[in-house]
């Protein structure tokens, strides 16, 4: 929990100051900033010295506004047409007796430098974000805080919201922040999305169809499944995110690399358009964009470079590690260094038997027997497996964490969190050492959503969590048989469902009924056993 910030000039001389001083030129006033706070860019609080009279304060306000206006006119005539949105000038004036007189506002560096040299100014402090001190936002490494709870949730959602191996009490309970995903666009670069599905609540839209002559419809189901895991009301990690279908693969689950590259390019350009719209005030509440690509093949520099370029323009990108039980560095886009490359885990916290591994795999997420949205009707669901199913968990998590940031049009907005920083934080807070059957040089990191807490800074500050190893039970044969029965009908190769498509609808319904009838009884026996 953040401590109360108590600042005094005398305290600045302490051994480990909470406030840092920037260099002082001559008699210029110091600029203070808290070392443990989130700074609001270009926003400052200025305190006058005690001897300053009301008349001098009034003159100072007139003086600072003239300087500010002059600086803004100069910038507008040069190359900064939108400076008014960043540097708003005088915002508040303060007078609490004679002990605290001052003002706050948004100013550029040259203006602040002039303020520093004014003889009536005691100090300048960088504005920063403050938070409520509610106990519910006190996040420890286990993520204990108040949260919304989705009951009867898919096991994958439950797993990323709990630190320890799932138990009978947690296997179907997803802890989450209700606003997760709000203001975030998710580009699903795949076979398309069943945008009419009820689980999307109207938040799914058709973005672009790349293959020539193909229809604006998901004829495969793979992309719809991924979209549901990212943003579905019941099946999704980030339940308020908007989904944009970017179709690069045809109904048979295959496509050309040229089309895939074009799809990534379209998503990147669309993202930049939304960024501009937010800056121009045409879109309120925009938080950023994420993308998921649960496809791939052999190593290709073009695809890796394309994904890295999309990340460089601001898209937070998740990609599947691949399903060949091999080194992910030999596959693309799994080898794209700037994306988050995702391996698959099973319900017993083992690495899924098909999942690729190695140093190019950044993190793991649930990918075996994942229930999500499907095609055929607006209510259809399906259970399939693959790193294709793991990657959307991470894409949804990126959207979830992005939504906990201030919107780009907010006056309290921080500098936009970069994909590089978000990736680093995602890995920093992951559960460490939870997975078994992990080859050498493979990060043993399992994704975590903060346990439903909505204070992103507190989640990051809490850091990682070392999992407690549990002995594997021998009494899981019935669960294993159920998983094998599901997987037998859906053969997953390089992230694509390529077998049994014609019979999926009837068999999926039967399997879904079988799962609902059996899962509580089977998992109760299994999970109670491994808990001891």
Give the predicted meaning of each segment.
Residues 1-19:
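Fungal secretory targeting signals
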Residues 21-39, 77-156:
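Autoinhibitory propeptides
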Residues 122-125, 153-214, 291:
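Acidic-leg catalytic submotif of subtilisin-like serine proteases
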Residues 159-162, 185-188, 223-232, 254-292:
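Substrate-binding/charge-relay-adjacent region of secreted/lumenal peptidase catalytic domains
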Residues 184-186, 190, 315, 330-408, ...:
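Extracellular S/T/G-rich loop segment that most often corresponds to the catalytic His/Ser-adjacent loop
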